[in-house]
Structures are given as C-alpha cells and as structure tokens.
C-alpha cells in the first residue's frame, strides 16, 4: 500500500523509500539528503503547504542522524488534512541536509534547534547558529555519544 505522495513520486520516478504507516495512517517516507531539496519543492507544489513540525534525533551511537519533517496539506473546505512524514538520514561525520527554510518559513527555529542539539548543518539556512546553548558550547548535547562536561551546579541550601 502507498500513500498519495509516495505514489506520485513513483509515477515521476523520484527516488524514495516508504517506511510504512503510523497508527493514524500517516505514511513515512525516507528521502536521501541529495534529493531532499527537490522533493521538498515538489511536495510544496503538490499541496503540502504547512510544515507542522521538524525535529531530529540520533538513530544509534555512532550511527546516522535523522531529520524528520511532518508536512500537512491544508485545503479550504477539507476537514481532515492529508499528512506525510519525511525522514532524511545523514552521516554522523559532517551531517549536511538542505534547509527547507525558503519553502516553509516555520523551519527556521526548528532547524536551528536540530543544529544546536545534534550538529546537523542545514545548507542555505540564513541564520544557522545555536539557539539554546551558548555559542561557546562544545559538542552536540542530544547525540548518544555526547560526553557531558564535568562541572557542578551550586545550589541553595534551604
């Protein structure tokens, strides 16, 4: 079984892999980083006009990093919008994924957070810098191989 976007991508010979459907019937597609920008543009033109969320996670210690996009197709007069989940996996060493900021402006802070916490560089993002951690922070705190710095917090004794 294929979702509508997946069937459209197959029809137009665009490389992707279906990872199945979640409990709500939303299909998850895997896209290669080098194909992501063109498929993101195609998705927008196809009608996925809203980026509901973007997040990232560390798949396994020493393994791949994943950037996840939840896209929604919002149409006037449609009560149940169509949704799709896109996963883009990047190599741990120098992870690079094209930014979708220029397609969906809501990707701005979300891609910055993924950069700040996991070190994924989003190519062509206009302000890719740390958003939660200080600029001087070393490392990527949400990576599974991250070693926390050895410091102690002074606490009030009450």
Swiss-Prot record:
Enzyme Commission number(s) from the entry: 7.1.1.-
SUPFAM superfamilies recorded: Nqo5-like (SSF143243)
Reactions performed catalytically: a plastoquinone + NADH + (n+1) H(+)(in) = a plastoquinol + NAD(+) + n H(+)(out); a plastoquinone + NADPH + (n+1) H(+)(in) = a plastoquinol + NADP(+) + n H(+)(out)
Membrane topology per record: Peripheral membrane protein
Uppermost EC category: translocase
InterPro entries on file: NADH_DH_suC, NADH_quin_OxRdtase_su_C/D-like, NADH_UbQ_OxRdtase_30kDa_su, NADH_UbQ_OxRdtase_CS
Keywords associated with the record: Chloroplast, Membrane, NAD, NADP, Plastid, Plastoquinone, Quinone, Thylakoid, Translocase, Transport
Primary location recorded for the protein, binned into one broad class: plastid
GO biological process: photosynthesis, light reaction
PROSITE patterns reported in the protein's UniProt record: COMPLEX1_30K (PS00542)
Record GO terms (molecular function): NADH dehydrogenase (ubiquinone) activity; quinone binding
Entry GO CC: chloroplast thylakoid membrane
Pfam annotation, one family: Complex1_30kDa
Subcellular location: Plastid, Chloroplast thylakoid membrane
Entry similarity comment: Belongs to the complex I 30 kDa subunit family.
Subunit details: NDH is composed of at least 16 different subunits, 5 of which are encoded in the nucleus.
Function of the protein: NDH shuttles electrons from NAD(P)H:plastoquinone, via FMN and iron-sulfur (Fe-S) centers, to quinones in the photosynthetic chain and possibly in a chloroplast respiratory chain. The immediate electron acceptor for the enzyme in this species is believed to be plastoquinone. Couples the redox reaction to proton translocation, and thus conserves the redox energy in a proton gradient.
HAMAP family for the chain: NDH1_NuoC
Protein name stated in the entry: NAD(P)H-quinone oxidoreductase subunit J, chloroplastic
């Amino acid at each position: 079984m294929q979702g509508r976007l997946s069937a459209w991508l197959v029809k137009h010979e665009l490389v992707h892999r279906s990872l199945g459907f979640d409990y709500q019937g939303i299909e998850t597609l895997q896209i290669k980083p080098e194909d992501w920008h063109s498929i993101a543009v195609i998705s927008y033109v196809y009608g996925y006009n809203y980026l509901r969320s973007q997040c990232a996670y560390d798949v396994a210690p020493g393994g791949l990093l994943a950037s996840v996009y939840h896209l929604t197709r919002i149409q006037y007069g449609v009560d149940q919008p169509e949704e799709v989940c896109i996963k883009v996996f990047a190599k741990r060493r120098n992870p690079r994924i094209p930014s979708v900021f220029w397609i969906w402006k809501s990707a701005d802070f979300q891609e910055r957070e993924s950069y700040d916490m996991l070190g994924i560089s989003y190519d062509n993002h206009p302000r890719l810098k740390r958003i939660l951690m200080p600029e001087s922070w070393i490392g990527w705190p949400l990576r599974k191989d991250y070693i926390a710095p050895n410091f102690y917090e002074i606490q009030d004794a009450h």
